[in-house]
Design a protein with these regions (language model features):
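Rossmann-fold cofactor-recognition segment
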Residues: 46-59
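N-terminal Rossmann-like NAD(P) cofactor-binding module of classical short-chain dehydrogenase/reductase
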Residues: 70-76, 98-99
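C-terminal catalytic/substrate-binding lobe primarily of soluble NAD(P)-dependent oxidoreductases
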Residues: 146-386
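ADP-ribose/adenylate-binding Rossmann-like module
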Residues: 79, 90-108
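N-terminal Rossmann NAD(P)H-binding glycine-rich loop of SDR-like oxidoreductase domains
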Residues: 5-19
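Helix N-cap at the beta1-alpha1 junction of Rossmann-like dinucleotide-binding domains, i.e.
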Residues: 35-37
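Rossmann-fold NAD(P)-binding glycine/threonine-rich loop
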Residues: 102-123
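Conserved Rossmann-fold cofactor-binding substructure of NAD(P)-dependent oxidoreductases
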Residues: 56-69, 79
Length: 386
């Protein structure tokens, strides 16, 4: 099998590339990047089956030619609100299986609409297979499966728990930060009271996590909020939220976003400020955040044995102690998607979010533990056991 890694030498993509480089099933890996020199230089750190090329994903002809020459594409080219939909369309049209780390809700809506097109041509596409979305979706799915019926799904993550990626081929404004500005300004889409609606980003939401108590978090514009009701239309509420280790985290964010919304500073400038702040921040240890919400989690509320119940799913305490970069947290789940595909464990045609029934959660988290050198098993908090 031949795999094309779009953005494969970038801050997220290089971690996925490193993780798949030793997959014996792969005949060839092509690292494609707008920065040709960076792609070629990064490819030199692997064996001969890995090559680097320059590729502008907005050049539709060259993109199509590259896709035709490969069996599957791993897309880490952001921001996805610009590049997600056209690249997925191109992959389907050129008979190339597809996986990405799309973390914007707007293109997620449009990409899910391509499901029938992908089914017609026998293409498997998984969108949002990173940390959040990605790991959070699968944790949320584990939580849902513990209940007899589900009315609310919440996926969440700690703004301060992941270290910024230290390496990247990217120059100029950081794409991840542009994404963050996009999803923290204005309104974002959520699913509430059985329908999709727009709410102000960073709106405060109280989270009741079994065994931990009630904490405040803030609504974030990630795809989980809309992908869960897409795949599970009987649920009533779906939110993605973020929290900080300190109140000052959200306060600083809101000040910078206010400056951007009032056009006092540009979105690029705001993104650069956030990127600088990330590099200056001391990340909290696990012991400093274990009393609050987990660093990453899925939470479901519903009914169990006729009574109201809730289930929270996160990594075990020992596993949460390991510090990871944003690149690792995002790129490694994508690599595992490819691994499961190569093993024949992802074999459905269509366009899916991670929770859409195409990934077995037990298979995924077992592979994740092996890749990261972690203890197997998740920490599952059940309200009826507390």
């Amino acid at each position: 099998m031949k795999v094309l890694c779009l953005g494969g030498s970038g801050g997220m993509g290089r971690y996925a590339t490193r993780a798949i480089a030793d997959f014996e099933e792969l005949e060839a890996i092509t690292i494609a990047d707008l920065n040709k020199d960076a792609a070629e230089e990064f490819a030199k750190s692997f064996d001969a089956k890995v090559q680097g090329i320059g590729l502008d994903v907005t050049d539709t002809k060259n993109l199509a030619e590259a896709l035709k020459e490969h069996d599957l594409v791993l897309n880490t080219t952001g921001p996805f609100f610009m590049f997600g939909v056209p690249i997925l369309k191109a992959a389907i049209e050129n008979n190339c299986h597809y996986m990405d780390i799309c973390d914007d809700w707007e293109p997620t809506e449009e990409m899910l609409k391509l499901d029938s097109h992908a089914k017609d041509v026998g293409i498997s596409a998984i969108i949002g297979l990173g940390a959040s979305p990605g790991i959070t979706n699968l944790m949320g799915l584990v939580a849902m499966e513990e209940l007899d019926s589900v009315d609310t799904v919440i996926t969440g993550w700690d703004l301060s728990s992941v270290n910024p990626a230290e390496e990247s081929s990217q120059t100029g404004t950081n794409a991840a930060m542009i994404h963050g500005i996009q999803q923290m300004t204005g309104k974002v889409k959520i699913f509430e009271d059985g329908q999709l609606s727009m709410v102000q980003s960073l709106k405060e939401l109280k989270i009741n996590y079994p065994g931990k108590g009630i904490y405040k978090a803030n609504i974030f514009g990630h795809p989980e909020a809309i992908s869960f009701p897409y795949h599970f239309p009987k649920i009533k509420n779906s939110f993605n939220v973020a929290h900080g280790s300190k109140k000052i985290d959200i306060f600083i964010i809101k000040i910078i976003l206010w400056l951007s919304e009032k056009n006092i500073i540009s979105q690029d400038k705001a993104a650069n400020i956030f990127h600088w702040l990330e590099t200056q921040t001391n990340r909290p240890s696990f012991s400093s955040k274990k009393a609050g919400l987990p660093a990453i989690y899925g939470l479901a509320h519903g009914i169990k044995n006729g009574s109201a119940a809730s289930v929270g799913v996160t990594f075990s305490a020992n596993n949460l102690e390991k510090e990871v970069s944003m690149g690792e947290a995002t790129g490694h789940p994508l690599a595992l998607g490819l691994k499961l595909f190569l093993q024949g464990k992802i074999n459905k045609s269509g366009v899916f979010a991670p929770e859409g029934g195409v990934i077995d959660t037990e298979d995924f988290f077992k592979a994740y533990a092996e890749l990261e050198g972690l203890e197997e098993g998740l920490d599952i908090s059940r309200s009826w056991e507390i």
